Amino acid sequence: MAQHFLQVEGLAKRFPDPRGQEGLTVFENVNFTIDKGEFACIIGHSGCGKTTILNVLAGLDEATGGGVIMDGREIAGPSLDRGVVFQGHALLPWFSTLKNVEFGVRSRWPGWKARQVTAHSTRYLEMVGLGQALHKKPAELSGGMKQRVGIARAFAIQPKMLLLDEPFGALDALTRGTIQDELLAIVEATHQTVFMITHDVDEAILLADKILLMSNGPFAKIAEIVEITIPRGRTRATIHHDPQYYRIRNHLVDFLVNRSQDYAGGGAEGHDPRHPPVVRPGLAGGATLVALPKPVDHSNPPASPAVLSHASH
């Protein structure tokens, strides 16, 4: 069985009650994988633990159960192998745009000469349309420009995985769309592996290869994994003309409005969070559900994954 680039198995986060009571289990038994070069979005209602999961992937927080393996190694603490972009830009206010990016590049490659650091940093700022704003301080930039700097800084260290926590949530619609296009172009050019939190189903359909649907908390878990079967080369201007678009969108909205409640607390009947179903609602004729393969048991040969087809033939 092929090894996945990122493997999340049995992840749980519990917060103890200082009064000695049972405490709060935000999520438990969270399982999913991401392949190298894949763009995965996670969607769910507030309070289900999406940002906590991202922080665990970043090494900024510790899970109370389960584990995360990236590129064959368990994640334990922050690393330059993972670039993070938060909703807030988190720029150093006393540094220029260029120096903010150079700061990360120097940390990644401490042996580089100054000219090499500057050229590398400038290239990534130009990729997000900031070639004319290299020497401006953050206070001189708009919200969209600040977020572009954060994206350039994350890409410039060439991480094995990029983690995005609602990076466009505070931006106006026009700026948001422009940066989405820039992000798509860079991801496709660099084959970057991405894990992104969003509340915007349209954004997820545009950007992602697959979408992880999270049930409501507490005791949240991955309910479904939706594969986006619309071919790559998507654009904001044309994606809604694809016949798959509204089938996928309606499926996502129905989950968020109706079906996510079925998983509250203990979970929906018959749902196994260790093997959340893979759903392809964009395909004509109905969804195809594929049970994810179980983790490899090295003492026995792996069984073939079951395939349940809900499509009409």
What residue spans do the PLM features occupy?
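Conserved ABC transporter NBD signature motif
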Residues: 66-78
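A short, proline-enriched helix->beta-strand linker immediately N-terminal to the Walker B motif
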Residues: 156-160
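Conserved ABC ATPase signature
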Residues: 137-141, 145
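The feature captures the beta-strand-to-loop junction immediately N-terminal to the Walker
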Residues: 43-45
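Short helical segment in ABC ATPase nucleotide-binding domains corresponding to the A-loop/adjacent helical element
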Residues: 98-106, 118
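Helix-to-loop junction immediately C-terminal to a conserved catalytic motif
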Residues: 58
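Conserved ABC ATPase "signature" region
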Residues: 114-133, 185
